[in-house]
Amino acid sequence: MPRSPLIVAVVAAALFAIVRGRDPLLDAMRREGAMDFWSAGCYARGVPLSEPPQALVVFYVALTAVMVAVALYAYGLCFRLMGASGPNKKESRGRG
């Protein structure tokens, strides 16, 4: 299978970037960033419950809409079943 010069060039550039990425200054910066990852100031903030975010409000509105739709469907189904007088009434039978 012949190798395309473009593929060889891309692989060579990727290998060169990997080897070149071993910079001591970059490694030192990564270690320093890893040491400063946890901060007590960030840990103590938590989630504000007094002012819910907009996503939470949208979630509860959607949940309420779904619950209302299910309740209305159940009410309509119950009303149809209670309105049918007997098992041979046309509205209470299936389509088959």
Curated annotation (Swiss-Prot):
Compartment(s) of residence: Virion membrane; Host membrane; Host Golgi apparatus, Host trans-Golgi network
Any GO BP annotation: regulation of peptide transport
KW Ligase (keyword) present: no
Topological domains, Intravirion: 76-96
UniProt keyword annotations, A-Z: Disulfide bond, Host Golgi apparatus, Host membrane, Membrane, Signal, Transmembrane, Transmembrane helix, Viral envelope protein, Virion
Residue ranges crossing the lipid bilayer per the database entry: 55-75
GO-annotated cellular components: host cell endoplasmic reticulum; host cell Golgi apparatus; host cell membrane; membrane; viral envelope; virion membrane
First and last residue of the signal peptide: 1-21
Source organism, top-level taxon: Viruses
Segments on the Virion surface face: 22-54
A GO molecular-function descriptor: TAP2 binding
Membrane topology according to the record: Single-pass type I membrane protein
Pfam families reported in the protein's UniProt record: Herpes_UL49_5
HAMAP family in the cross-refs: HSV_GN
Subunit structure: Interacts (via N-terminus) with gM (via N-terminus). The gM-gN heterodimer forms the gCII complex.
Record-stated family: Belongs to the herpesviridae glycoprotein N family.
Role of this protein: Envelope glycoprotein necessary for proper maturation of gM and modulation of its membrane fusion activity. Also plays a critical role in virion morphogenesis.
Name under which the protein is recorded: Envelope glycoprotein N
